[in-house]
């Protein structure tokens, strides 16, 4: 097997053709890829009739990046922690560390968290770790929050900001949040239920590896910071297609982090409750209502809900839809092929159409599932796996 080298631009174009997302700027060194594991990949049973659920989420995108400032409502300090685009799970611990540090600076005797998605839950757990009693005020518990509709991929720069709208300090802040989150994820590896796990991801393309794709016109320039993490993530490997089961012109492989959303969220909820945390069901209609809480320091983790609650029109919805195929225990790798992403999880195999890149779903607030979209994505995969073979 020969070693291939690519320019950064060629690499990104190749990944885009395969449907790769997340850490898109992280140009990896290409290595000779041992094909032993690729020889024993299980095929996906890609049939539309195996879809048992379809969910839609609205990612809370802000051009300037997440909102992490503070404001006072009468005698109450509100610390904001929302607007993470498609990076909420990935940046959760790092962003919440910043928010909680601002909350603790007021030396409160107790802390309130509004919102019970992944940002709310990690904020609550970090405040508890600092010795503070915490009450989460929420309309929905975590298992029914928008966070549960995420794909489960580690994508810390997915729709995190626009390149020309962030402050000069933001790239370093993003790196700080990402590295802090990664240190926390490390502590969740190997736990029962595999809440966080390293898996292989295969980027399969019908185009030769060095094929260039013309840039799309009229696209927003979403920030991409993966190159700042080259010391952490494993090199990508170029595999000979003949050494893999895929009949394709180009096959690449790299290690990626995957979240088992169901088991991970249950673990976070359990930890919060064991530590004495309280959850109170409450819906806020005006920010001023937070001043009526007994806690005088509040961390606001309302996600896309902040657009209406805080009248923050800088929050733009980015619609995302995923279909769930019936789980296959033997299918344990992720895949990107023809603008379709596949992520194996214990609660279902996630299939997501990603054509259009980061602009897909931009400013679309529809929560209505599109069955045709999911069927088409699965049928695309069926064509790939219909030619699945034992490597020669």
Please describe what each predicted stretch is:
Residues 1-19:
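N-terminal secretory signal peptides and thylakoid transit peptides that target proteins
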Residues 14, 18, 54-75, 147-149, ...:
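Flavin (FAD/FMN) cofactor-binding and adjacent substrate-gating region
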Residues 30-74, 83, 89-97, 117-130, ...:
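Active-site substrate-recognition segment that forms the wall
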Residues 87-91, 170-177, 252-267, 368-372:
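Short beta-strand to alpha-helix junction loop
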Residues 140-177, 235-236:
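Glycine-rich active-site loop/strand segments that organize a redox cofactor
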Residues 278-292:
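A conserved short coil-to-beta-strand element within the FAD-binding core of flavoproteins
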Residues 296-302:
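Short hydrophobic core segments
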């Amino acid at each position: 097997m020969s070693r291939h080298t690519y320019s950064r631009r060629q690499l990104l174009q190749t990944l885009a053709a395969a449907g790769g997302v997340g850490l898109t700027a992280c140009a990896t060194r290409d290595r000779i890829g041992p094909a032993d594991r690729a020889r024993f990949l299980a095929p996906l049973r890609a049939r539309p009739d195996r879809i048992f659920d379809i969910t839609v989420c609205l990612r809370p995108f802000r051009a300037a990046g997440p909102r992490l400032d503070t404001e006072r409502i009468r005698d109450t300090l509100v610390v904001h922690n929302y607007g993470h685009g498609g990076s909420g799970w990935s940046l959760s611990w790092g962003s919440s560390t910043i928010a909680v540090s601002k909350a603790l600076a007021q030396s409160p005797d107790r802390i309130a968290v509004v919102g019970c998605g992944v940002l709310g839950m990690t904020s609550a757990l970090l405040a508890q770790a600092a010795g503070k009693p915490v009450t989460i005020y929420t309309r929905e518990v975590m298992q029914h929050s928008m966070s549960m509709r995420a794909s489960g991929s580690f994508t810390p720069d997915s729709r995190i900001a626009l390149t020309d709208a962030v402050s000069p300090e933001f790239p370093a802040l993003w790196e700080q949040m990402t590295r802090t989150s990664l240190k926390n994820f490390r502590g969740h590896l190997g736990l029962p239920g595999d809440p966080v796990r390293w898996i292989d991801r295969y980027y399969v393309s019908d185009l030769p590896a060095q094929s260039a794709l013309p840039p799309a016109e009229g696209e927003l320039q979403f920030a991409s910071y993966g190159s700042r993490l080259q010391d952490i993530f494993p090199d990508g490997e170029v595999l000979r297609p003949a050494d893999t089961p895929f009949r394709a012109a180009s096959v690449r492989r790299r290690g990626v982090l995957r979240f088992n959303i169901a088991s991970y969220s249950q673990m976070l909820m359990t930890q919060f409750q064991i530590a004495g945390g309280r959850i109170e069901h409450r819906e806020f209609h005006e920010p001023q209502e937070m001043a009526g809480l007994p806690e005088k320091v509040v961390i606001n983790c309302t996600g896309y809900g902040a657009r209406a609650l805080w009248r923050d029109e800088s929050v733009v919805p980015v619609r995302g839809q995923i279909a769930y195929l019936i789980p296959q225990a033997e299918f344990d790798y992720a895949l990107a092929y023809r603008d379709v992403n596949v992520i194996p999880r214990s609660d279902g195999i996630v299939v997501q159409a990603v054509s259009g890149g980061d602009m897909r779903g931009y400013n679309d607030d529809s929560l209505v599932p599109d069955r045709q979209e999911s069927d088409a994505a699965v049928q695309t995969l069926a064509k790939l796996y219909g030619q699945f073979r034992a490597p020669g």
